[in-house]
């Protein structure tokens, strides 16, 4: 009798300890659902759709009016062409500014709309709110920019070499390259998303910090090897399936292996989310000047 009582008490205590985690997961999923609707259906989403469609539109134009360059005349040269397009346009412009728009507005947009207090008055831990909002931005950016990456590959290859492209992607190395590019896009959304979440939380006008970060990422090829590692783009470029020359003025540095690059970005993201959660616990709402 005594043993069953102790077992019941132990089970109750264990359930009490586990119950908050179940509640936090439910609250996170609820926030995720609400924020996804905002991210995809609000007026702010229009700019995001235009940005995501930009590379696809440009490649569509190139499919109609193909250049005379040798790289466009054979399927083997297209891998270098896509590496150039992905590095300069998709990764450094579309994904970067798209993540800036999505993640900076997760909290900053609520302040501008004067609606953040609804969340803060709800019985939700601030850390749960941060995780739910971050996940919503992550899902939004990965879906949109992942589709941009794959659609850009399709628009570059298939209009020119339809049968060869089918064999290249479904039987050759193209499928693996497509997955790697998709993985790099995902990691970019994870890393840049964490950075711009913090920027949106700490700065009343996040545009200037975002431009400074953009400049730092762009001059990465000029930085000494140690400083290169203090950027997201270094780890992303290290994973490229088709490396691209950074020009004659680039400071040479060894690419960081994937087994270091991927965990480094994930650990960095966790640290930033912890900092964001700590900040929101002490955050007071003031709509003055917004």
PLM regions with names:
Residues 36-51, 137-138, 205-211:
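Alpha-helical transmembrane segments and their helix-start/interface "positive-inside/aromatic belt" motifs
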Residues 38, 109, 122, 153, ...:
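Transmembrane helix-loop junction
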Residues 43-45, 125-127, 131, 173-174, ...:
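Membrane-helix interface segments
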Residues 32, 105-139, 288:
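Helix-loop-helix units of permease transmembrane domains in multi-pass membrane transporters
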Residues 19-21, 57-105, 130-202, 242-265:
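Secretory targeting signals
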Residues 58-70, 203-245:
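Transmembrane helix segments
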Residues 3-49:
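Aromatic- and glycine-rich beta-strand/loop motifs that create alpha-glucan
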Residues 3-7, 198, 267-290:
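Junction motif at the cytosolic side of a transmembrane helix
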């Amino acid at each position: 009798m005594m043993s069953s009582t102790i077992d019941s008490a132990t089970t109750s205590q264990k359930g009490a300890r586990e119950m908050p985690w179940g509640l936090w997961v439910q609250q996170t999923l609820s926030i995720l659902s609400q924020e996804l609707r905002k991210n995809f259906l609000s007026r702010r989403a229009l700019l995001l759709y235009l940005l995501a469609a930009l590379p696809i539109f440009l490649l569509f134009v190139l499919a109609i009016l193909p250049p005379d360059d040798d790289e466009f005349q054979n399927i083997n040269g297209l891998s270098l062409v896509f590496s150039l397009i992905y590095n300069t346009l998709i990764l450094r412009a579309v994904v970067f500014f798209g993540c800036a728009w999505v993640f900076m507005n997760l909290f900053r947009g609520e302040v501008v709309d004067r609606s953040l207090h609804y969340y803060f008055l709800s019985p939700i831990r601030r850390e749960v709110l941060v995780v739910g909002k971050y996940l919503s931005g992550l899902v939004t950016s990965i879906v949109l920019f992942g589709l941009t990456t794959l659609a850009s590959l399709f628009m570059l290859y298939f209009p020119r070499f339809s049968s060869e492209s089918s064999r290249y992607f479904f039987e050759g190395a193209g499928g693996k390259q497509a997955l790697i590019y998709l993985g790099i896009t995902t990691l970019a959304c994870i890393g840049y998303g964490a950075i711009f979440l913090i920027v949106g939380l700490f700065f009343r006008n996040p545009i200037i910090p975002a431009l400074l970060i953009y400049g730092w990422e762009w001059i990465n090829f000029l930085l000494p090897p140690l400083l290169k590692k203090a950027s997201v783009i270094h780890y992303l470029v290290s994973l490229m399936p088709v490396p691209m020359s950074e020009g004659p003025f680039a400071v040479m540095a060894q690419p960081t292996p994937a087994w270091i690059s991927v965990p480094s970005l994930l650990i960095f993201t966790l640290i930033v989310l912890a900092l964001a959660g700590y900040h929101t616990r002490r955050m007071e709402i003031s709509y003055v000047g917004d």
